[in-house]
């Protein structure tokens, strides 16, 4: 394409999404794409990494990506501008993807920018991970979501019901019967729901998304579970051809300053990176030993962070020299239920600064921080080995306990001036001690012998037993008294962060009451020690001596109430969500008289 054709292409620029798509479509697409989806803005300057684009098209075969050899001399990254973005969905799988039009950065074309201040209508939405009962029968809608995102029901009717009309990302309309019934009563989608799940081939673990606009327009979408992600069938077009196509398209655009289109999937690695984000990541200067955190999508559709350490910096492929793409080799702190990469790109992770990013225990968050001059030189007697222990902070996931030391930095300057190490905590002045003199004095004063004349080595008797107080133990005891016995401000004592967190956890953990029909005395069960519904049922059977009667559900039903006193059946929600909202567990006879909550 000649350079003169660039201006003629400008009227074809489309904008953030296809003009035929509405704002409701855009919001539904983003929810179906997931919490980690990062789409660039129209007109934004970005870096395009061909290696990442090739990795996406080769995901179906998982070849050795580091052995990929470019067919032509193409830079590892190209600076481009975003010309247009179209948000689309695959016909068969309902997987979201975006077609992003790029142009090598040039001033020859005036690129429209996205108006951030334009009016955005108010939308309500909710997502839910489907359970086995959701896919085999009616769909249970939690009361909060039903009130916020679905049209209101006429509760004056004996059986409140209505028909919902929802549109998916393909423009297809689906009709659902929404009613409020059952024992206990709850919001259900019945008629039409089975046809929807069958057509979309939904299974337990998939996610359903509902979006409702100000005008009452209802949209519905889905998001497949991670293990169901489809790939491009290699039988349709060879992997080699796709690889050559990606590189040839980028090379042609780079040489001729013309537009080219790339396909981006939300769950793929980010190979289109904001210019500012790239510079920030590179300026972090990740080195071997640096600590970091990285975001992933959890099984419950939520964002989760994992921590790790950089153990190497090298090119991902020998054919792409000095490329920032996956040039950091990492080691993860703990096991995960899904596969994580052992090489990542700098913009995918966040650098952990030990002195700044370690959360303080909530017990101390309201206390006034003392100024450096309040601590002064009174803490200069602290031994550096004690201050610098446990300095590997951040080796934890969001769900694991924190092991935080009182020390947040390990630099020569801090060792020379230990008072700076305690700036993050308010500590009362401690008496100035000289450990060298104290150690000698304590050794001399605490030696008791049975005879006045014996041989000594460094003040210790070599002949008769001596009663000697360990100087190191004495020092540690003194520090322990000063750090654990002194108070922050006026009332709070200093404890280890692990102890504080353990105490907070135990204080918030409460047992859940269990009420059974026909039994006067209530029982209680501790959900925090159980790992799922199976263990809960076994625990309930043991509490009421039912011996297998709850597992069959032939005689008894198990329900629970939430903070709004709404009754719902046990087992319809993911276990963590159930533990968060359960107020009381109810056991009542199947088909019998309703159990009144006490």
Curated annotation (Swiss-Prot):
Cross-referenced Gene3D superfamilies: 2.30.30.1040, DNA-binding pseudobarrel domain, Phosphatidylinositol 3-kinase Catalytic Subunit, Chain A, domain 1
Taxonomy, superkingdom: Eukaryota
Cross-referenced SMART domains: B3
Every PB1 domain range: 509-590
GO molecular function: DNA-binding transcription factor activity; transcription cis-regulatory region binding
Key words, A-Z: Auxin signaling pathway, DNA-binding, Nucleus, Transcription, Transcription regulation
DNA-binding region: 124-226
GO cellular component: nucleus
BP GO annotations: auxin-activated signaling pathway; regulation of DNA-templated transcription
Domain topic, free-text comment: Interactions between auxin response factors (ARFs) and Aux/IAA proteins occur through their C-terminal dimerization domains III and IV.
Family: Belongs to the ARF family.
Protein name as catalogued: Auxin response factor 22
Species of origin: Arabidopsis thaliana
């Amino acid at each position: 394409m000649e350079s003169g054709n660039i201006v003629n292409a400008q009227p074809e620029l489309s904008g953030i999404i296809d003009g035929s798509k509405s704002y409701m479509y855009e919001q539904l697409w983003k929810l179906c794409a997931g919490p980690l989806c990062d789409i660039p803005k129209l007109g934004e300057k970005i870096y395009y990494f061909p290696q990442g684009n090739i990795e996406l098209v080769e995901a179906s075969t998982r070849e050795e990506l580091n052995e990929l050899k470019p067919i032509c001399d193409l830079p590892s990254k190209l600076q481009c501008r975003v010309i247009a973005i179209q948000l689309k969905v695959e016909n068969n799988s309902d997987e979201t993807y975006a077609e992003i039009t790029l142009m090598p950065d040039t001033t020859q074309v005036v690129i429209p920018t996205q108006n951030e201040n334009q009016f955005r209508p108010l939308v309500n939405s909710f997502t839910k991970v489907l359970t086995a009962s959701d896919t085999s029968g009616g769909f249970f809608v939690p009361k909060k979501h039903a009130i916020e995102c679905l049209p209101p029901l006429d509760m004056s009717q004996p059986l409140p019901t209505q028909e919902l009309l929802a549109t998916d990302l393909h423009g297809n309309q689906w009709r659902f019967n929404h009613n409020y019934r059952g024992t206990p009563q709850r919001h259900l989608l019945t008629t039409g729901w089975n046809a929807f799940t069958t057509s979309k081939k939904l299974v337990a673990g998939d996610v359903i998304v509902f979006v409702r606009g100000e005008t009452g327009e209802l949209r519905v979408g889905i998001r497949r579970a991670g293990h169901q992600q489809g790939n491009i069938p290699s039988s349709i077009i060879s992997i080699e051809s796709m690889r050559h196509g990606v590189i040839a398209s980028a090379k042609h655009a780079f040489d001729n300053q013309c537009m080219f289109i790339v396909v981006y999937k939300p769950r793929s690695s980010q190979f289109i990176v904001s210019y500012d984000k790239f510079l920030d990541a590179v300026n972090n200067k990740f080195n071997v030993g640096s600590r970091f955190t990285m975001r992933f999508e959890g099984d419950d559709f939520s964002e989760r962070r994992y921590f790790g350490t950089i153990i190497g910096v090298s090119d991902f492929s020998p054919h792409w020299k000095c490329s920032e793409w996956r040039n950091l080799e990492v080691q993860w702190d703990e096991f995960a239920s899904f596969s994580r990469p052992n090489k990542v790109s700098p913009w995918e992770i966040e650098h952990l600064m030990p002195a700044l990013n370690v959360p303080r225990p909530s017990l101390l968050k309201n206390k006034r921080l003392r100024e450096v001059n309040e601590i002064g030189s009174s803490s200069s007697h602290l031994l550096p080995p004690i201050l610098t222990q446990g300095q590997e902070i951040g080796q934890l996931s969001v769900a694991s306990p924190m092991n935080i030391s009182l020390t947040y930095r390990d630099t020569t300057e801090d060792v020379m001036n230990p008072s700076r190490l305690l700036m993050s905590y308010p500590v009362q002045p401690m008496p100035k001690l000289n450990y060298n003199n104290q150690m000698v004095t304590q050794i001399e004063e605490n030696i008791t012998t049975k005879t006045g004349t014996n041989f000594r080595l460094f003040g210790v008797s070599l002949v008769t037993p001596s009663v000697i107080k360990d100087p190191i133990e004495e020092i540690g005891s003194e520090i322990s008294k000063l750090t654990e016995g002194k108070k922050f401000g006026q009332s709070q004592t200093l404890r280890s962060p692990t102890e504080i967190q353990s105490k907070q956890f135990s204080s918030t953990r409460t047992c859940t009451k269990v009420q059974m029909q026909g039994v006067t005395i209530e029982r209680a069960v501790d959900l925090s020690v159980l790992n799922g519904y199976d263990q809960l049922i076994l625990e309930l059977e043991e509490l009421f001596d039912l011996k297998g009667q709850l597992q069959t559900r032939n005689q008894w039903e198990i329900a629970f109430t939430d903070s709004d006193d709404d009754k719902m059946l046990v087992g319809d929600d993911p276990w963590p969500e159930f533990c968060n909202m359960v107020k009381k567990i109810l056991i009542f006879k199947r088909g019998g008289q309703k159990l009144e909550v006490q």
